From Swiss-Prot:
Pfam families: Actin. Disruption phenotype: Mice have lethal defects in neuronal development, including defects in activity-dependent dendritic outgrowth. Keywords: Chromatin regulator, Neurogenesis, Nucleus, Transcription, Transcription regulation. Belongs to the actin family. PANTHER family: ACTIN (PTHR11937). It is found in: Nucleus. This is Actin-like protein 6B. It comes from Mus musculus (Mouse). It comes from the Eukaryota. Induction: By retinoic acid of P19 embryonic carcinoma stem cells induced by this treatment to differentiate into neuronal cells. Involved in transcriptional activation and repression of select genes by chromatin remodeling (alteration of DNA-nucleosome topology). Component of SWI/SNF chromatin remodeling complexes that carry out key enzymatic activities, changing chromatin structure by altering DNA-histone contacts within a nucleosome in an ATP-dependent manner. Belongs to the neuron-specific chromatin remodeling complex (nBAF complex), as such plays a role in remodeling mononucleosomes in an ATP-dependent fashion, and is required for postmitotic neural development and dendritic outgrowth. The lineage of its organism: Eukaryota, Metazoa, Chordata, Craniata, Vertebrata. Transmembrane segments: none annotated. Residues 39-82 are annotated as: Essential for mediating its function in dendritic development.
Length: 426
């Protein structure tokens, strides 16, 4: 291996895509990630004394992290939930390392020093954080080669494009990111906090208005079937530990997220009371057995994504709806490349899986697109590709023969220090 260049397919590179909602990791060249688990981890401040290391738990100086769906779902005394990310960037490094350790030991089941690593990062990631991550991977995990790539670029690659406007609507934010020839155009990034978590908040308010209790499954010992709209008949578990508020909240959110995915739908034209009242209702049963039909509210809640003006409780309400986010972003780019952006608007992120999301977006954009431009929306039909697109893009990229000279090799890192990430990873 002269000069530390790897051969495309036999590298066995790993691809990590760590988002605010879930962690996706696996081998390059495969079509979907091996691991897909919540980024949120349970944190227990351990008492002094011998703690046995259990499945999915990592112990660090008096802290126990509960990672992965199973470990996180066990109710425990005083376990808080936390996330290593803030605004899409790594904030809590200790927690981040616990997630990496878990991924290596339980999902990849291999030693870190055998595999080059390609990681995705937020397009607005800071230089200091990029350097710290590079240092962490080479020093602590001793990996042979490393590369950092912006999520939007990977998403474009996953959809067979090197130029396009990536509209990414995830848990914490919705962003429009222009990509040109595989580079992110920083000046055109537009972010809006109206995304999956915002919709969850709206659902929570709906349940409060309708006086529906959200009871997460962990509290329920037994339930009886009841008539539609009748008060639920369920038994609470007897010996429940004193769970923390943050953990209980997290479990409630899981119920809400299921409701979101099953019931909500984006109206294909701006929301109208009369039209919404005519829509077919959807039946949904809460974990405690309470069940009822949802009609107009199915359309009213997601409307806030596209038209924030009628959402109550948004301060000053200068927020941009999804359609505006796209047009504003394209408007901030050079006039010569706009046709290429309008010609491939790539839709990605778990929140875009709401029924009717792309139809509505298409409709809004066709009204806003200048007549001289051709508009094309690229939205994969498979749930998996939309949720995992940055990962899939990374998997494609890291297994390309032509990419192999792009890696930062361990040798380069040792000679050039952590600054080399700024030079080698755009």
């Amino acid at each position: 291996m002269s000069g530390g260049v790897y051969g495309g397919d036999e590298v066995g590179a790993l691809v990590f895509d760590i988002g605010s909602f879930s962690v996706r990791a696996g081998y390059a060249g495969e079509d979907c990630p091996k691991a897909d688990f919540p980024t949120t981890v349970g944190l227990l401040a351990a008492e002094e004394g011998g703690g046995l290391e259990l499945e999915g738990e990592k112990e660090k100086k008096g802290k126990i992290f509960h990672i992965d769906t199973n470990a996180l779902h066990v109710p425990r005394d005083g376990a808080e939930v936390m996330s290593p990310l803030k605004n899409g960037m790594i904030e809590d490094w200790e927690c981040f390392r616990a997630i990496l350790d878990h991924t290596y030991s339980k999902h990849v089941k291999s030693e870190p020093n055998l595999h080059p690593v390609l990681m995705s990062e937020a397009p607005w990631n800071t230089r200091a954080k990029r350097e710290k991550l590079t240092e962490l991977m080479f020093e602590q995990y001793n990996i042979p080669a490393f590369f950092l790539c912006k999520t939007a670029v990977l998403t474009a690659f996953a959809n067979g494009r090197s130029t396009g406007l990536v509209l990414d609507s995830g848990a914490t934010h919705t962003t429009a990111i222009p990509v040109h020839d595989g580079y992110v155009l920083q000046q055109g990034i537009v972010k809006s906090p109206l995304a999956g978590d915002f919709i969850s908040m709206q659902c929570r308010e709906l349940f409060q208005e309708m006086a529906i209790d959200i009871i997460p499954p962990y509290m329920i010992a037994a339930k009886e079937p009841v008539r539609e709209g009748a008060p639920p008949n369920w038994k609470k578990k007897e010996k429940l530990p004193q769970v923390s508020k943050s953990w209980h909240n997290y479990m409630c959110n899981e119920v809400i997220q299921d409701f979101q995915a099953s019931v909500l739908q984006v109206s294909d034209s701006p929301y109208d009371e009369q039209v919404a009242a005519q829509m077919p209702t959807v039946h949904y049963e809460m974990p405690n057995g309470y069940n009822t039909d949802y009609g107009a509210e199915r359309l009213r809640i997601p409307e806030g994504l596209f038209d924030p003006s009628n959402v109550k409780g948004l301060s000053g309400n200068t927020m941009l709806g999804v359609g505006h986010v796209v047009t504003t972003s394209i408007g901030m780019c050079d006039i010569d490349i706009r046709p290429g952006l309008y010609g491939s608007v790539i839709v990605t992120g778990g929140n875009t899986l709401l029924q009717g999301f792309t139809d509505r977006l298409n409709r809004e954009l066709s009204q806003k697109t200048p007549p001289s431009m051709r508009l094309k929306l690229i939205a994969s039909n498979s749930t998996m590709e939309r949720k995992f697109s940055p990962w899939i893009g990374g998997s494609i990229l890291a297994s390309l023969g032509t990419f192999q000279q792009m890696w930062i090799s361990k040798q380069e890192y040792e000679e050039g220090g952590k600054q080399c990430v700024e030079r080698k990873c755009p």
